[in-house]
Amino acid sequence: MTASTKDILATAIRSIPDYPKPGIIFRDITTLLGDAAAFRLAVDELVKPYEGLGVDKIAGMEARGFILGGAMAHQLSAGFVPIRKKGKLPYRTVSMAYALEYGTDEMEIHVDAVKPGEKVILCDDLIATGGTAVGAVKLLRQIGAEVVSACFVIDLPDLGGRKALEALGVEVRTLAEFSGH
C-alpha cells in the first residue's frame, strides 16, 4: 500500500478526543464508511493480500466487522461468518469468553459456521488490546477453522493487540496506525 493510500484512509477516519472517557481518542470509521471512495479503497486494500488464496470464509466481529467483512466476502467470493455477542444467534452455538479492560464477555458463532480445515480471515474495524480478536481466533480454531490472517482498518500499536495475535501464530494486516489510546 502506498503512503498516499495510507494518508487518504487515515484522513477519512474521524478522531474524537475524550470519548468514551477522558484521555481516550476514539477512532471513528463511520466517516470512512460514509465516503464512498474511501470505503471502496479500504475494502480493496483489505482484500488485496488474499486474492487468489482460496479463502473460504471471512469472519466479522460485531458490529463494524460485519460491514467490512461482508464487503470483503463479496469481493473474494467467500462466505461470511458473523461473530456475535452471546445470545444473539438463533441456532446452536459455541462460545468463548474473552478479556475486557474490566472483566470478561462472551462471543459465539453457529456450530456449523465453518467446516474443519476451511481457510478463514478474521476482520474488524480496529485492533487495540487484542482481547476480542484473540477470543475470536480461539473460537474459530475450536470449530476447526484455519485462521489464515486477521485484518483491521485501524491499529493502535501502543496497546499491543497485534503482538497478542502474532503470539498465536496469526498474521496481522492493518491499513492505518494511530499512536496512543
UniProtKB/Swiss-Prot annotation:
Disulfide bonds: none
GO cellular component: cytoplasm
Predominant location category: cytoplasm
Catalysed reaction equations from the record: AMP + diphosphate = 5-phospho-alpha-D-ribose 1-diphosphate + adenine
Pfam family, one: Pribosyltran
E.C. number: 2.4.2.7
Pathways per UniProt: Purine metabolism; AMP biosynthesis via salvage pathway; AMP from adenine: step 1/1
GO MF terms, alphabetically ordered: adenine binding; adenine phosphoribosyltransferase activity; AMP binding
Record's subcellular location: Cytoplasm
Keyword tags: Cytoplasm, Glycosyltransferase, Purine salvage, Transferase
GO biological process: adenine salvage; AMP salvage; purine ribonucleoside salvage
Known role: Catalyzes a salvage reaction resulting in the formation of AMP, that is energically less costly than de novo synthesis.
Subunit structure comment from the entry: Homodimer.
Family according to the record: Belongs to the purine/pyrimidine phosphoribosyltransferase family.
The protein, known as: Adenine phosphoribosyltransferase
Gene: apt
